[in-house]
Amino acid sequence: MATQDFYQVLGVSKDANERDIKKAYKRMAMKYHPDRTEGDKDMEIKFKEIKQAYEVLSDPQKRQMYDQYGHEAFEQARQGGAGHGAGGFGGGGADFADIFGDVFGDIFGGGRRQQARAQRGADLRYNLDMSLEEAVRGKTVELEIPTLVECRDCNGSGAKKGSKPQTCGHCHGSGQIQMRQGFFAVQQTCPQCRGTGTIIKDPCRTCHGHGRKEETKTLSVKIPAGVDTGDRIRLANEGEAGEHGAPAGDLYVQVHVREHPIFARDGNNLFCEVPVSFTKAALGGDIEVPTLEGKVKLKVPKETQTGKHFRLRGKGVKSVRTGEVGDLICKVMIETPVNLSSKQRDMLEELEDSMGTGDEAAKFRPKEKGFFDGVKQFFDDLRS
């Protein structure tokens, strides 16, 4: 990254106080910010140098280490931590990887050596398809899950029965080795044991030393009432078995609710369209509407218009989180009669004639009058 001394990058002296460093950073960052330099690659690099310099010099601990070991030491540690070319193993000198690891680890990825640990099992996902009725009421389902399970013959160790894994002699069980580069020691995963810290000299014949084997397991899963598309149910430790006795992953059941031929769902409310004859809508009366528990009666007032909504409280879905029950909202759709006989057409024409025309008919069809009045006003405005 920065080839210049960090103090030079920010344009401050080595005895600059925190306020001066912050002020210089703001000035330089504003000057070289990518939004101002319009994709200039050199300016982007300069901006990153400024940011890196400020990250070090604004932190008292990092600044003290930087002042003590110098910019060249910092650059070598950064390059080593980033996995650049390295010299041989061993060698003398201070272990600067440990010194810089905690202090500069957030900048160039360094860190202290960690004890080798077996890898946790992978998480699994199962897509569960459900009907609306099943989702609303809840159900218990049997799931067939192809997965990796712990080998029963070696109890997950990977070693043949009667034997056990041996400590890796290359890394002495740490799973990490050190490579020297100048003054610095760079940690890498041990190639002999691949970071596990152990070597299996006599592998289990069932799992071939992996400690796990492929198997399809059956799980009985209770799906709570009220789930909806997008909900996810976590089953802890039901994912793939971990390596060599490490914890298993989790299983996530992803819910998808199929579309229903009658009901649509929005949150905890259900919606449906209810056909009503034009005579029933005009005269009023009772109709039957469907719910998930069966049919119920709904009183339709006289002169009901198409699109009118009626709310049936408590006939929706029970929330899986709060326990509150939503409503069923019915939208009236008035049906125009079809396949009329001659007599029925004559009766409708007689009804139409009885309503008159013009202003006389407006009281029977207020929306129609309002619509045509609006159309007339629209064209009047165009002409004016």
From Swiss-Prot:
Pfam families per the UniProt record, alphabetical: DnaJ (PF00226), DnaJ_C (PF01556), DnaJ_CXXCXGXG (PF00684)
* Annotated binding of Zn(2+) 2, by residue: 168, 171, 190, 193
**What does the note under cofactor report?**
Binds 2 Zn(2+) ions per monomer.
* Subcellular locations according to the entry: Cytoplasm
* Annotated zinc fingers (CR-type), start-end: 138-216
Q: Where does Zn(2+) 1 bind?
A: 151, 154, 204, 207
Single GO MF annotation: unfolded protein binding
Q: What InterPro entries does UniProt report for this protein, alphabetically?
A: DnaJ, DnaJ_C, DnaJ_domain, DnaJ_domain_CS, HSP40/DnaJ_pept-bd, HSP_DnaJ_Cys-rich_dom, HSP_DnaJ_Cys-rich_dom_sf, J_dom_sf
Q: Which residues form the J domain?
A: 5-70
Instruction: State the CDD domains in the record.
Output: DnaJ, DnaJ_C, DnaJ_zf
Task: List the disulfide bonds in this chain.
Answer: none
Q: Which residues cross the membrane?
A: none
CXXCXGXG motif repeat ranges per the UniProt record: 151-158, 168-175, 190-197, 204-211
Q: Tell me which Gene Ontology terms the entry assigns under biological process.
A: chaperone cofactor-dependent protein refolding; DNA replication; protein refolding; response to heat
Question: Gene Ontology cellular component?
Answer: cytoplasm
Superkingdom, natural source = Bacteria
Q: Which cofactor does it need?
A: Zn(2+)
Q: Which UniProt keywords apply?
A: Chaperone, Cytoplasm, DNA replication, Metal-binding, Repeat, Stress response, Zinc, Zinc-finger
* Protein family membership: Belongs to the DnaJ family.
What is the UniProt domain comment for this protein? The J domain is necessary and sufficient to stimulate DnaK ATPase activity. Zinc center 1 plays an important role in the autonomous, DnaK-independent chaperone activity of DnaJ. Zinc center 2 is essential for interaction with DnaK and for DnaJ activity.
Q: Explain the purpose of this protein.
A: Participates actively in the response to hyperosmotic and heat shock by preventing the aggregation of stress-denatured proteins and by disaggregating proteins, also in an autonomous, DnaK-independent fashion. Unfolded proteins bind initially to DnaJ; upon interaction with the DnaJ-bound protein, DnaK hydrolyzes its bound ATP, resulting in the formation of a stable complex. GrpE releases ADP from DnaK; ATP binding to DnaK triggers the release of the substrate protein, thus completing the reaction cycle.
What assembly does the database describe for this protein? Homodimer.
Name by which UniProt lists this protein: Chaperone protein DnaJ
Organism expressing this protein natively: Idiomarina loihiensis (strain ATCC BAA-735 / DSM 15497 / L2-TR)
The organism's lineage is: Bacteria, Pseudomonadati, Pseudomonadota, Gammaproteobacteria, Alteromonadales
